[in-house]
Design a protein with these regions (language model features):
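Short acidic, gly/pro-rich beta-turn/loop elements at beta-sheet edges
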Residues: 16-18, 50, 62, 98
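An amphipathic, aromatic/His-enriched active-site/gating alpha helix that lines ligand/cofactor pockets
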Residues: 20, 24-36, 55-89
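Short, well-ordered beta-strand segments in beta-rich or mixed alpha/beta enzyme
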Residues: 2-9, 39-66
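N-terminal first-folded block
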Residues: 2-36, 40
Length: 99
């Protein structure tokens, strides 16, 4: 399984638009093949920061997600609303156990 974490901090005047775009992206992405989960959250310590958490079946599914035109457009649109550069990290993960 591939785990993706990411974040972006919006400007005060663009936060509502950034949140709306992010929710649209998350809902669309959940329907893609290989998407196990895809979520966006507001950071409790910085209410202008959106935090993404995604789980993908494998790297191929994630690369297909990145290739979707709507995903590429989302990244461009979100970056235009950001106060600073976004971050994204990929992890190769194995579930050890569900508690």
């Amino acid at each position: 399984m591939i785990v993706v974490t990411g974040s972006v901090t919006a400007r005060q005047d663009t936060f509502d638009q950034a949140r709306k775009l992010s929710l649209e992206h998350v809902h669309r992405s959940r329907g893609e093949p290989g998407c196990i989960s895809h979520a966006v959250h507001v950071d409790c310590e910085n209410p202008l920061r959106l935090v993404f958490f995604e789980q993908w079946a494998d790297r191929a599914a994630l690369l297909n997600h990145f290739a979707v035109p709507a995903s590429r457009e989302f990244v461009k649109s979100l970056q235009s609303l950001a106060a600073a550069a976004s971050s994204i990290e990929l992890y190769d993960a194995t579930r050890l156990e569900k508690l």
